[in-house]
Amino acid sequence: MKKVTTSTLLKMKQQSEKISALTAYDASFSKLFDEQGIDVLLIGDSLGMVLQGCDDTLGVSIDDVAYHTRAVRKGVERAFVIADMPFMSYSTPEQTYLNAAKLMAAGASMVKLEGGRWLLESIQGLNERGVPVCGHLGLTPQSVHVFGGFKVQGRDDLQAEQMLEQAKEMAAAGIQLLVLECVPTELAGAISQAVDIPVIGIGAGPETDGQILVMHDMFGISANYMPKFSKNYLQETGDMRTAVSQYIEEVKDGSFPSEAHSFSK
């Protein structure tokens, strides 16, 4: 079983093969997802909401993410493992380097940062220090209070243009992957075409290079509500393994997400 690497993901984009991704937080589920053929696993700061029961992700610490990264890594043989850098753990380049080192030591193969051009120095510095970086634009949950809630981003022309330019700048600075969350399908498609790196969407329509969902949403077991962009695969299949396999299959063949799970301008 050949391991997924940054080179694998880039080749998948170049060959128009969709990338499948899910969040994971422990060894049991990471093993289950890995065995079904998931390409990417993200230890998301979403753990603050789905595991810790909080209303947002802001209370998650770097130690929380490192703990779950160690657990996830133990269940994985093939999938590419990414760890979120949580709120205020990367405010300065120096702080970013130290905290990224903790996540890489815990078993991550890449770290994910939320934000735009203010991160360029940190992105370049991480690359120089051997740490692969995933960017995250659109609805960045750590900025929920700035946005005034969990809202679709990039619907007006100015905001869309700014997001496109920031994606280009971050790619030039050295990110090797980009997550777009809750942005209109047209914008997500334009960004995916404008950068050479793989773009993975969540609530960003079918035109990105891949899809990611929070595992609890994909299984329909989130405590609060089911986001518009998600789909309850466990309800459809009645079995966790089959649910994961169907999710992967629908991402690969392009049937998920449909228009019903996407946002328009």
Swiss-Prot record:
GO cellular component terms listed in the entry, alphabetical order: cytoplasm
Keywords carried by this UniProt record: Cytoplasm, Magnesium, Metal-binding, Pantothenate biosynthesis, Transferase
Entry's EC annotation: 2.1.2.11
Entry keyword annotation includes Phosphoprotein: no
Compartments, as annotated in UniProt: Cytoplasm
Active site: 181 (proton acceptor)
Cofactor: binding comment: Binds 1 Mg(2+) ion per subunit.
Annotated SUPFAM superfamilies: Phosphoenolpyruvate/pyruvate domain
Enzyme's top EC category: transferase
Molecular-function annotations in GO: 3-methyl-2-oxobutanoate hydroxymethyltransferase activity; magnesium ion binding
Names of required cofactors: Mg(2+)
Involved pathway(s): Cofactor biosynthesis; (R)-pantothenate biosynthesis; (R)-pantoate from 3-methyl-2-oxobutanoate: step 1/2
Physiological role: Catalyzes the reversible reaction in which hydroxymethyl group from 5,10-methylenetetrahydrofolate is transferred onto alpha-ketoisovalerate to form ketopantoate.
Similarity comment: Belongs to the PanB family.
Listed HAMAP family: PanB (MF_00156)
Protein name in the entry: 3-methyl-2-oxobutanoate hydroxymethyltransferase
Organism: Pseudoalteromonas atlantica (strain T6c / ATCC BAA-1087)
